[in-house]
């Protein structure tokens, strides 16, 4: 048999095997478009705007359907009812973390966000408990955020009303908050180590949100054998790991088990207690990955939302004027905003909710996986199947939010101007995998934005109608365009 014949037979066998596997799986799974061998439905998906493709498929196949992103099936949940039924009503069964190959290659399943099974349960439980011990949800963490808000204002004053790109400054503020919780550090906004660390975090988010990364995660074999920006992710993560290991070593040398200072101290104490336990989850690897998760989620989510908020406030100056009028009336100019103010500021609260709804920061959420075979809406979903939830379909639901593509704080106000809650407000996801730092994130958004608007007027360099608010990347996350503005002291 010559080489050509052998290759043809091998390729044909692989295609037939792929077709057979897909056929047997598809008989049990929810409906969906017919996949091609090996590449699945990939050519039918717009990798620059996956959520838009999912909406298109949902019109044909309904709120629960199957796509093959490569050779593996992925169940898609579209719309509030399907997502609620899965993540809340069947939360435990949908609590697995779906495969995310690019990250798994480096973190090896450690940490909080991408771990599974007992490791995930243990780390999530530990994190929630010690966030409480460190004052999250209490007055002392509010004091810390207020202090950082004043540092942020002082840094913005240094721009002296000149045009500036706010990205770096808005990165530093939330980073300082989460770093003070994790290893009790407060960095100067010009600190080179912190800026380098944040550059790595920012670069990874941009790469992960690129169309190329959607290709890599669907075809994991590309990761090792093809050149591309995806290799930069591993280098950046390894840099961050080495930086954090130094911080951990410093903590080990100064640890006082009777007086824990921060998240790392609590972890090291737990590590000592678990020394005699077989297969303990409290390794240094797990700690470094957990801190990366906390800093990545706690900094990038916040700074991107703040950047988007300022862009939208310049685009819609009438909204800014209403918020500043409410700040003047409720808080005034002679004290710092506090969380008690929020209940007296329905328009400001509605504006912040609308920013999060409108920008739709993580359009398809992080992938879930079912932890056991499950019958869901008369379909059989095998254990381990990846599940994607379209948060876009909830946050931009036209029945709940009329004209969802419009930025309108009225989406969260009743006819009397009071704040109106919505079950469809799911920017932090829902269920067992919902963001552990949601409370802290809400606090920072309110205190940072009100403090900025209390002290400055926002001046755009272009006319409001010329401001473009469309995301420049819309993959893993929706990222706003870069822009400049002037912070004019008020």
UniProtKB/Swiss-Prot annotation:
Localisation per UniProt entry: Endoplasmic reticulum membrane; Microsome membrane
Induction per the UniProt record: By growth hormone. P450 can be induced to high levels in liver and other tissues by various foreign compounds, including drugs, pesticides, and carcinogens.
UniProt keyword annotations, A-Z: Endoplasmic reticulum, Heme, Iron, Membrane, Metal-binding, Methylation, Microsome, Monooxygenase, Oxidoreductase
GO biological process, any: organic acid metabolic process
Pfam families: p450 (PF00067)
GO MF term set: heme binding; iron ion binding; oxidoreductase activity, acting on paired donors, with incorporation or reduction of molecular oxygen, reduced flavin or flavoprotein as one donor, and incorporation of one atom of oxygen
Keyword Membrane attributed: yes
Keyword Hydrolase: no
Catalytic activity: an organic molecule + reduced [NADPH--hemoprotein reductase] + O2 = an alcohol + oxidized [NADPH--hemoprotein reductase] + H2O + H(+)
This protein's GO CC annotations: cytoplasm; endoplasmic reticulum membrane; intracellular membrane-bounded organelle
Cofactor(s) needed for function: heme
Lipid bilayer topology: Peripheral membrane protein
Top-level lineage group: Eukaryota
Enzyme class, first EC level, given as a word: oxidoreductase
EC numbers: 1.14.14.1
Binding site for heme: 435
InterPro entries with a match to the protein in the record: Cyt_P450, Cyt_P450_CS, Cyt_P450_E_grp-I, Cyt_P450_sf, Cytochrome_P450_fam2
Modified residues (Dimethylated arginine): 144
Recorded family membership: Belongs to the cytochrome P450 family.
Function according to Swiss-Prot or TrEMBL: Cytochromes P450 are a group of heme-thiolate monooxygenases. In liver microsomes, this enzyme is involved in an NADPH-dependent electron transport pathway. It oxidizes a variety of structurally unrelated compounds, including steroids, fatty acids, and xenobiotics.
Protein name: Cytochrome P450 2C7
This protein's encoding gene: Cyp2c7
